[in-house]
């Protein structure tokens, strides 16, 4: 075997070994999300001293990295999350990823709702709590969000509140927010996906303020337009107009098909 061929074999072998070593010692995992249209997440990653470390790091030297901070204009669904890092000589490990779920519902800057989800990371976890990965190295946790609507102000502008709950493997809603937990040793090189669905129907934020009718809901008048709560109290005949995001005046939400003059 000539020298050139031996050199090629040696270089190829070293590259293969280095590649495998790098794969086995990955110091990050991929966080991604499958979200409804007009949804985006912001991720903040928090680190704590590794188990056995006696050191502490001032907050100013251990700031939480953020992904998708400019979620309206520069949103990217994939984020590479560092698992271990060193600050001031102290070995740190990821403790949790706090997730803001933002969703736009209207044309104005303030026409958006926000909810929260979380990925927790521990050195050890009970098997019943620890999320698992499939053969492709992917793990998914799911949730469902629903819009809750109400009116604010004397003109009764529609505003919405985003309510998100975790769903189990069968799609049933749970009481907690979307959440998943992993151990440090199972994360390197893996992918964690947050999958969120949007409920087909919206519902009133407060009970006894709207009446269900064909095409949607009618807003109870209460004591008048200045009555911010305007509970129905059994009066299902006197209703008010309200203003949709964007200013349209309507009598039925969300199936508004006509403009109405405001009557006081």
What are these regions (language model features)?
Residues 1-8:
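Bacterial N-terminal signal peptides that target proteins for export
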Residues 9-14:
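Hydrophobic helical h-region of N-terminal Sec-dependent signal peptides
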Residues 29-40:
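Structural motif
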Residues 42-166:
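Structured domain cores in non-transmembrane regions
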Residues 124-264:
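A eukaryote-biased signal for long
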